[in-house]
Amino acid sequence: MRASITWYDLLSALPDATSEDIQQAYDAKAGLLRPELLSGAPSRVITVAARAQGILDAAWRVLCDPVSRQRYDEAAGLWDSGGGLVRPGDYPAESGLPDSDYAADNPGAEVLRGLGALNVWLDRHSDYQRRIPVPDVRGLFYDVFLGVVGRLDLQVTFVQLTEHPMPVDGLVVDQSPEAPTKIHRRGELTVQVWHPPGRATGDSPAAPYTRPPLT
């Protein structure tokens, strides 16, 4: 079955990652959304950054707690009955969480729902000549986005929004065509990507970030 996008993918973490690895993956991405890095950014970037933070928080909520993580891993079929990691090609098409685990306004759940539905559609329509619905990729970091489109065989055109970008992972803030427009397999998807601006004296990566408690 076609590999699905998981909560782990949204954090750029592996299913066998330790709790410390999960925390570090979250902190690395959330650190790029700090207010001082967003200062002066266009309003649409601020809006999408809030969506991105919601996606990260949703993934963190599921994976930071051992009980919820185990329940998710089992529901998503990431581990076999013997406790071994399932091969990527055997991942289920669905997202792995029942609807009751999703808040209606949860952006992370919204992303997984959309990508999970697309995976199901692709499993049923494998003909490369068919048109596929474009997923909503706004709020994904660029490395996560590449993982998504790599599974869809879409051709990507990258538009850099920051004149002197900091050498860190960028944030997808807009796309063309918009979701859920249908395009041909191997069709072109254009994304606009924002990076924090580099310092005038030289680009510098973001400072370490520690996640505050969620309320």
Regions flagged by a language model, labelled:
Residues 129, 172, 186-188:
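Extracytoplasmic
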Residues 27, 31-35, 61-68, 150, ...:
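Sec-exported extracytoplasmic/periplasmic mature domains
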Residues 8-9, 59-62, 70-125:
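Post-J-domain flank of DnaJ/Hsp40 co-chaperones
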Residues 178-203:
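Amphipathic N-proximal alpha-helical interface segments
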Residues 121-162, 200-215:
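Glycine-rich loop/hinge motif
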Residues 156-183:
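BRCT (BRCA1 C-terminal) domain core and associated BRCT-interaction motifs
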Residues 1-46, 55, 121, 131:
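N-terminal J-domain/J-like co-chaperone modules of DnaJ/Hsp40 proteins
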